[in-house]
């Protein structure tokens, strides 16, 4: 079919009536379908069930003989640090192993910065007024909510196919009130974008007016490739060291979507200066995280290579989901009413519909029993200035449910576009 913009008003009205008839048939079915959150379903979690049968009863000690059932080792098992370092090309000495949640580590990191400052701070951040934070959008709603909760003014920077609009980022960091920015550098939520080498280099090299500016580098999807045909991400620490800016980076990741979202292992990585400043406060907060779970993961995987194989098995299953969603979205090709991403990994598809129609699409899909991520969630303050972005999370529904939900979504996008163009 030709572009909707090329249809006459009479043609649009006839098409709208036909599509609305189909829509009403879906409404009558009383469906309950969910495309709103990026989480694995039961069959994907089953791939990690070997984790539950790891027998620790014969040996619950670390390599150095530490009883993992007891207190101690504030920053985690040395072999867990080595595992993450080898898997993600990090320095093992930079790593602090946490509990199951990298988001909690991020929250704690910002809390400490507000209460005590960071290395290079003149005073605790909370003693300064009018602090600002760069948020790349579309982006991760929980990141935005966290910095909003802490009282930062959120500054929106556009996400481009190569990553953040670096011209805008470099302009904003000239303001000493701008203390940091969020980055999901590989298979970014929700666009699936991986930052280009140039973008990573510019982030590492840029001059910041605030001497204690920090990049929260949330590498959540570091190994979440669908196949061997994957995106490669430049090494932020190597580049930051090259420009003398290693202190700038707070790096986070976890096994949340590698094994179990509620039972994985999270970590942060930071420079020696940052770790020296962090550790005393961390020691006041906890005597140590769950070493039994660290040991369980180490014995389940054994080597990073085994984890990569595990992730390729998981990636094959998830790619089927993405292929189903993308095949349905292809029905919109040539209509000039929507664009969408086709990532090589991660958990999300980003759909941009006609400006001013995303909320209407949301209402239509909701009316037919399909739950989407609320419109605006991918932007600071929950406001999409163009009312155009939708985030799809294909991983959780069954294949049949996913196909049905995407059919309804496509129908809603068509109806909303026709309403916008005039019928």
List each language-model region with its residue ranges.
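Conserved core of the PLP fold type I
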Residues: 60, 66-211, 222-244, 358, ...
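Walker B catalytic acidic pair
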Residues: 219
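Short amphipathic alpha-helices in soluble, non-transmembrane regions
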Residues: 361-367, 406-410
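Conserved core segment of the aminotransferase class I/II
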Residues: 98, 238-319, 330, 418
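Conserved glycine-rich beta-strand-loop-beta hairpin in the small C-terminal domain of fold type I
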Residues: 312-326, 337-352, 366
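N-terminal "arm"/small-domain region of PLP-dependent enzymes with the aminotransferase-like
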Residues: 2-75, 79-86, 367-370
């Amino acid at each position: 079919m030709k572009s909707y913009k090329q249809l006459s008003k009479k043609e649009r009205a006839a098409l709208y009536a036909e599509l609305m008839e189909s829509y009403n048939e879906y409404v009558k079915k009383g469906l309950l379908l969910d495309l709103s959150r990026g989480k694995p379903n039961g069959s994907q979690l089953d791939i990690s069930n070997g984790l539950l049968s790891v027998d620790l009863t014969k040996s619950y000690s670390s390599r150095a003989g530490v009883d993992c059932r007891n207190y101690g080792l504030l920053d985690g098992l040395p072999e867990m640090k080595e595992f993450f370092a080898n898997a993600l090309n990090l320095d093992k000495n930079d790593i602090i192993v946490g509990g199951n949640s990298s988001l909690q580590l991020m929250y704690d990191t910002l809390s400490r910065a507000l209460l005590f400052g960071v290395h290079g701070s003149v005073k605790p951040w909370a003693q300064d007024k009018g602090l600002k934070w760069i948020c790349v959008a579309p982006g991760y709603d929980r990141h935005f909510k966290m910095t909003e909760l802490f009282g930062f003014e959120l500054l929106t920077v556009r996400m481009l196919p190569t990553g953040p609009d670096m011209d805008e980022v470099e302009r904003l960091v000239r303001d000493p009130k701008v203390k940091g920015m969020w980055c999901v550098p590989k298979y970014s939520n929700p666009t699936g974008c991986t930052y280009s080498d140039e973008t990573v280099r510019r982030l590492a090299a840029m001059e910041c007016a605030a001497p204690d500016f920090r990049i929260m580098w949330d590498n959540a999807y570091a190994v979440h490739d669908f196949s061997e045909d994957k995106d490669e991400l430049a090494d932020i620490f190597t580049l930051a060291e090259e420009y003398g800016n290693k202190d700038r980076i707070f790096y986070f990741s976890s096994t949340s979507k590698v094994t179990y979202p509620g039972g994985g292992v999270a970590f942060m990585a930071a420079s020696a200066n940052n770790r020296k400043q962090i550790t005393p406060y961390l020691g006041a907060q906890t005597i140590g995280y769950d070493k039994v779970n660290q040991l369980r993961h180490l014995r389940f995987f054994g080597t990073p290579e085994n984890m990569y194989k595990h992730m390729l098995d998981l990636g094959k299953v998830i790619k089927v989901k993405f292929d189903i969603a993308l095949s349905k979205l292809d029905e919109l090709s040539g209509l000039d009413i929507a664009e969408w991403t086709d990532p090589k990994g991660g958990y999300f598809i980003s759909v941009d519909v006609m400006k001013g129609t995303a909320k209407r699409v949301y209402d239509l899909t909701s009316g037919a029993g399909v739950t989407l991520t609320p419109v605006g969630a991918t932007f600071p303050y929950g406001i999409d200035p163009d009312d155009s972005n939708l985030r799809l999370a294909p991983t959780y529904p069954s294949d049949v449910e996913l196909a049905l939900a995407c059919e309804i979504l496509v129908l809603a996008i068509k109806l909303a576009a026709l309403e916008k163009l005039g019928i």
